[in-house]
Amino acid sequence: MAQKLQKSRSKSTLLDQKFWSHFAKSYWEKKSLHLKNVKSGLLEMSDSEIFDLLVLYADHCREMNDPSGFKFYTDGIKADEEQVLEVLPEATDKSLLGYHKRMNSLFPDYCLVCDELLQVNLKKQHLLTDFTDDLYRHVGFPNRFSEMGLYLGNYKKTPFGVHVDSCGVFSFPVSGLKKFRLWPAAYGEKHPELDRTFNYEKHKKHS
């Protein structure tokens, strides 16, 4: 039994048309799904490549003196533009972990958000469009756009509190561990006070 279980856990999840058809019917805008060993072109990007893109865009922001596309939070408080420019990744950090170690030594709770990761390298754009094209065949096109963002930090809670995203979200861990606390949609509807709160101790048992 143990051997069979181990074999099952190591099996890869292929995001083919059969998968997307089932996903659209059973999960899309209905409930969350956690997958292991996913086979996707998006995962071709290594953490070192992502770091290089991050530094490239950070250099662009410093040159333009405009951190648009980046957001930085400490203890849940959003930093102003001047502060953001001071804490962006640098080539001397050498890696995502190197940047994290530098920020971790300065801030007990921080979160860096970058929503423009692919804007500086069009050669990687196809990785996102290949992924979304397969999805759109089964759920239709969005009325706005798709983007690839990066969240990096040591934050214990999302900087803007408990929330419902106004779009579909796919999360791929790049380095380290990412945890989510989720509530059933029906529970959230019955408890609107959950929205944007940081104090949800009494609701934890229902998550």
What is each of the regions a protein language model found here?
Residues A2-S26, S40-D47, F51-S207:
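Active-site region of the double-stranded beta-helix
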